Amino acid sequence: MSKVIGIDLGTTNSAVAVLEGNQPKIITNPEGNRTTPSVVAFKDGEIQVGEVAKRQAITNPDTIVSIKRHMGEANYKVKVGDKEYTPQEISAMILQYIKKFSEDYLGEPVKDAVITVPAYFNDSQRQATKDAGKIAGLNVQRIINEPTASALAYGLDKGDKDEKILVYDLGGGTFDVSILQLGDGVFEVLSTNGDTHLGGDDFDNKIIDWLVAEFKKDNNIDLSKDKMAMQRLKDAAEKAKKDLSGVTQTQISLPFISAGPNGPLHLERTLTRAQFDEMTADLVAKTKIPVENALKDAKLTNADIDKVILNGGSTRTPAVQEAVKQWTGKDPDHSINPDEAVALGAAIQGGVISGDVKDVVLLDVTPLSLGIETMGGVFTKLIDRNTTIPTSKSQVFSTAADSQPAVDIHVLQGERPMAADDKTLGRFELTDIPPAPRGVPQIEVKFDIDKNGIVQVSAKDLGTGKSQNITIKSSSGLSDEEIERMKKEAEENADADEKRKEEVDLKNDVDQLLFQTDKTLKDVDGKVPEEDIKKVKDAQEALKKAQQENNLDDMKQKRDDLSKLVQDMTVKLYENAQKNQQAQGGPASGAATDAGAAQGSDDKKSDDDTINGDYKDVSDDDKK
């Protein structure tokens, strides 16, 4: 089996790792960075991903960030020009970019991947992530929870040590807490909890709101209505947040942020860590409830926890670290990089799948309860949250009315007692139930959850044996045909992007060659035959003409022709120089001098030349 890469598809940044020699290793992106911004931009018909997309976000309104926050949303689309994109398609562009530079690093095609998701992602969000992988041309071998992945990265070399660990995972857009039992190579998730709409972006927004309010107070101008100004504020807020992890105050300086009646306006503010802690205190406090719930579900107390692991870039915030220490009574473990741990753990799971990692068993859980709607709009649970997966559970129900010919199976996920308050995963109907008094027909409803946390539900009339089933699709409703179409479009875009890159490289080559040819012609003037110079000049003009006509095939041919002529002319230049030197009796080159020296020390002329050379060097030194 070929290599299985592990991908942390993050809200603000993504990372990828692969197993090498039984150890996971981060694959750096083309810019040499270990994480890649989860940013996609559309510019002049070209799709840009990562660093380059983030850099031009200020000036390009067609830049998409934090798309992960919308995964699994039924009707969410991003409009660019006259085309609309689903969150799966945008995520697929990020995955496709990661796939490409991973292939460049490994030197072989990459087909298989393990992709991580927040532990508290529901079925729709998980399915949407899997669909994004398919569109990107990846065979998603496994979807695993981010805290579980970081626990794998932490626990791989801990051997048979028996520990209970709490993973506090605060990323760019999501928050999870999981409690795991580690021992003898078994990673068992005991409980998980979280908030899929809480993360570093919210911390940034607190700074942005403060800056907007301060600027409005001073200048009576609302920057929130200026898209370009808001992008600059977002970049400045993110930088300030990072700065305050290491220093107690930071300067925010944004010149020419707006204009007033008297000319340009600048934004200058000092933000202290104490101010930042105060404005984000409610966000930090919001993470406490999931921590308490996870402990409660695992039937543990703080005293039972051996280690606390912090995961996600937002856990670098000192107030977050202090709060976690206060709540758990434990100093967080800093042995793994919070930005990289999830990708490293995903790579380990990839190694388990490919057979490269032995004696590691991962037992994950379903984050939310699953069940169906029953009479009176009640949510009847079949599988409770934090049940180890894969799992299967069935229950027998009956009809609510006499001679009821069909039952509507409304599949739900959540924790609220009433069906209307929970998340609908899907609906299907079991028909042709023989007429009978209410309560007589026996309808068995069975839930199956696979290792990826994806649900299949079936209903069977035990009297007739008739059955119906449904594999829950993402609520964003992508059919297999739509996924295939998007996959094809993604491949075509990749081909078009590659072609565009080749075109740019060719044009750069031509510009460089024309410039170099001009320089070479000046250097060789009077030193090579005129006919050779004429040939080069003619070829140069032919290339310029092809360049003006933008004929790529012709440009390639003319570039190669000119390049060969310039090389031939340069060779002649050196040959002529060598002949002239030999005619004057001097050594033609260092090699000739060595050869002369090898012929014997009684060759007085060679000795004289050597002495003269030394003498000249000394004279030069004296001049200095």
Curated annotation (Swiss-Prot):
Keyword Metal-binding found: no
TM segment ranges: none
Alphabetical keyword list: ATP-binding, Chaperone, Nucleotide-binding, Phosphoprotein, Stress response
Organism encoding this protein: Lacticaseibacillus paracasei (strain ATCC 334 / BCRC 17002 / CCUG 31169 / CIP 107868 / KCTC 3260 / NRRL B-441) (Lactobacillus paracasei)
Its job: Acts as a chaperone.
Modified residue annotations for Phosphothreonine: 174
Name under which the protein is recorded: Chaperone protein DnaK
NCBIfam families: PRK00290.1 (NF001413), prok_dnaK (TIGR02350)
Compositionally biased tracts (Low complexity): 581-600
Region (Disordered) location: 544-563, 576-624
Protein induction: By stress conditions e.g. heat shock.
A molecular function (GO) term: unfolded protein binding
Lineage: Bacteria, Bacillati, Bacillota, Bacilli, Lactobacillales
CDD domains per UniProt: ASKHA_NBD_HSP70_DnaK-like
Residue ranges with Basic and acidic residues bias: 601-624
Gene that encodes the chain: dnaK
Keyword Chaperone: yes
Similarity-based family: Belongs to the heat shock protein 70 family.
Pfam families registered for this protein in UniProt: HSP70
